[in-house]
Amino acid sequence: GQLIDIHGGGKDLKFPHHENEVAQSYAVNDHGLANYWMHNGMLNLDGGKMSKSLGNTVWAKDIIAEKGSNVIRWLLLSVRYRDTLNYSDETMKAAETELQKIYTPWKQAIIKSAMANAELGTEVDSEHFEKFMEAMRDDMNTPNAYAEIFEVTKLLNQSLRVREVDWALVGKWVATLDKMLDVLGIVF
């Protein structure tokens, strides 16, 4: 068969499952199965292993119905993909709180600019966006990418809390946040 670009799975499948797939591919095709192998960390529930056999599973569709896709996506991306993630009421609440800290000034910028009849620009701050992308290129280092999102959120907050608002600057921070969040699949 053809070589595929990316093959992924849980890090618990690395040996023997994925190593067997590589061996089988070489035996049949004289080449490996994939250019890149990505092994994700495990998802724990309240500090313990989540498993169908243990009967302690949580369904994504139920979480999305209750909390929305942005919150679960934010939580899932809050750790590096290779690290273990603990799902609990506390971690979900933390994800909601963090997203709200970004959403509130973002929404204020939209509302206040409309009230001031000011148009927000679409220029993205290249320096902050590049720092965000550097983190993403560093083996999807989402914790560092999140730090850059919070830095831009802080700058947006500061630009809204002055007597004479510079709407072009506000627009730049909003556009930068939009572009960063779009990379993560989060849309306000």
Where are these regions (language model features)?
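Alpha-helical recognition segments enriched in aromatics with Gly/Pro capping
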Residues: G1-I110
